[in-house]
A protein has these predicted regions:
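Small beta-barrel nucleic-acid-binding modules, primarily SNase/OB-fold domains
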Residues: 2-5, 16-144
Length: 144
């Protein structure tokens, strides 16, 4: 009985596909090449021969400059936005592998995805560095 169980496990291991595994997510990972970092929250990538603009999923990053949606913008937000942009640019530039876990296409036509660099969630890294906040309905107050 034990021998049958071991044989079954061995056969199962032979047929289960092996690939990137990040957590318990049943995700599909799409390889990508960075083209241009727009800011800390958006990047142009080359994906399967097509240029796409990708917004980070689940996080909000500071804005580089004031806009109509951001009446509370201040110089501190601009400073943090530059740090976030440079952080993303540096990490994408040194990554050996970049994978996208695409969540959706937003109403502006941007792809919303989790960006993995060498198996690490780049959005989470921005959160750890205090260069992003979790994407909630609350407007982040960078200028406190």
């Amino acid at each position: 009985m034990f021998r049958i169980l071991l044989s079954s496990i061995f056969l199962l291991l032979l047929v289960v596909p092996v690939g990137p595994s990040y957590g318990a997510c049943p995700c599909t990972y799409t390889p990508a090449l960075p083209i241009e970092v727009i800011d800390g929250g958006a990047v142009w990538f080359l994906v399967e021969g097509e240029e796409i603009r990708v917004q980070f999923a689940d996080i909000h990053t500071p804005e580089l400059s004031p806009n109509s949606e951001n009446a509370n913008w201040c110089e501190e937000e601009g400073r943090k936005a530059i740090l976030a942009r440079d952080f993303v640019s540096q990490h994408l530039g040194t990554a050996k592998e970049i994978l996208l876990d695409i969540h959706e296409i937003d109403m502006n036509g941007d792809t919303v995805a989790v960006i993995y660099i060498d198996g690490i969630d780049l959005g989470q890294e921005l959160l750890y560095q205090y260069l992003a906040t979790e994407n909630t309905s609350d407007t982040p107050l960078w200028c406190q």
